[in-house]
Amino acid sequence: MQENQATAARENIMGTMDINPLLVKLSVPMMVSMLVQALYNVVDSVFVSHVSESALTAVSLAFSLQNVMIAVGVGTGVGVNALLSKSLGEKNQERANKTAQNGIFLAFCSFAVFFLIGLTCMRPYFYAQTSDAEIAEQGIRYLRVCSVFSLGLFLQTMSEKLLAATGRTYLSMISQLIGAVVNIILDPIFIFGYCGEALSGTTGAAVATVIGQFCGAGSAIFFNLKKNPDIQISFRGFCPSAETIRRIYVVGLPSIAMQCVGSVMTFFMNQILMGFSATAVAVFGVYFKLQSFVFMPIFGLNNGMVPIISYNYGARDPARVKKTIRLAVCYAEAIMLCGFCIFQFAPNKVLSIFAASDAMLAIGIPALRIICPHFLLAGISVVLSSVFQALGNGVFSLIVSVLRQLVVLIPMAWLLSKTGNVNMVWWSFLIAEVVSVLLSLGFMKRIDKTIIEPMER
């Protein structure tokens, strides 16, 4: 009886509530959650920058592999989110429960992989990017802790996706806040040596991060067990389902690959910029942390949008699908406009947060001003990427991402670097985004003809 009431309540929200307030209701908590998630990336760098520029560069070089961990966790969660929402839309409670169980199992599998990577691959990873032993050793200490103790990251990410898929985004937001607050409190305590020299600097930043992740994971697991009646999580007699895992990764793998493409991009961009100076690498690392405050709210918007689209796709309601897409694009563009204004008119203010030296300001101020116009185009492609995933066409998202970040961005950055002017390298972002938007619009036209329009018949 309780299960039927929960399903009926969900149908009232996802299937009948007006799209605009529904999208706001589901997205705003996730947008706050994503902004909080951005703090995980930024807070470490802010405090570490007050230790030394070499420590900041080390954390910047760590970002590529760190982003792969996040990609695996989030991408798997995206697949679980889409399949779980679609199952509930189709009133298939058994498949919804099985999806949740297999999602948690995959979180443990992901941890096992990165545990081994953390023990074996840190040294070659850093020395492939820099010959500066001081930078490399600080990076090794930081990333080894983050990977060996990554279980908190994967459990937190998966548990929050389960909450989001069932419309409980405010609980996901609370778990994010818990983890971030713990991280922010512990960061200066560890980084500046108040817990001993062995746990100071970049090592301390990593320790604070993983403790925050475990706290966030614990709260998210609690909320799923006690506050989420739409799914029943029990591992009594559990056996991994190859079919369920396959369906999760039909959507999830393109998302993982798409984010991993970003890691490959940052790895090679660091190589290109290192040809100018370590300061240029630090500036790029700072830019990536800062732009997360612009893009993360849109990722949160997408997390609220995806279950609405997936649910109404399962319920065959094309009008609600179309309206959700239109509103999401409008909100995304408004957010991107705000980000553009901040980067264009106050770059020195945002760079000063990272104790930027005169050399960093000389490179960073023109860099932020040249890069930020691509924000105005990126809002469209980022939203459409999640639309493709929600409608079971995640491969389109992957194609767009690979084209933008590898086929166009890196070759253009390399060619422009041959001018000997680091400022020219930053124009590659705008060039790549123009190509990305054009391709995304082409794919969306195809999706409309093959998936959305047939639902109207």
Predicted regions, residues:
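Helix-terminus/linker motif at the lipid-water interface of multi-pass membrane proteins
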Residues: 35, 39-57, 126-133, 189-200, ...
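Short runs within selected transmembrane alpha-helices of multi-pass transporters and secretion channels
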Residues: 77, 146-164, 172-180, 205-220, ...
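Structural signal for membrane-spanning alpha-helices in multi-pass inner-membrane proteins
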Residues: 118, 161, 187, 191, ...
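Interfacial/gating helices of multi-pass transporter permease domains
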Residues: 47-67, 134-138, 202-204, 244-251, ...
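Small-residue-rich hydrophobic transmembrane alpha-helices
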Residues: 56-116, 153-172, 283-347, 378-400
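Transmembrane helical elements of multi-pass membrane transporters/channels
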Residues: 25-44, 145, 156, 179, ...
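Short alpha-helical transmembrane segments in multi-pass integral membrane proteins
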Residues: 1-27, 84-151, 197-253, 309-374, ...
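N-terminal transmembrane alpha-helices
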Residues: 14-46, 50-51, 67-79, 83, ...
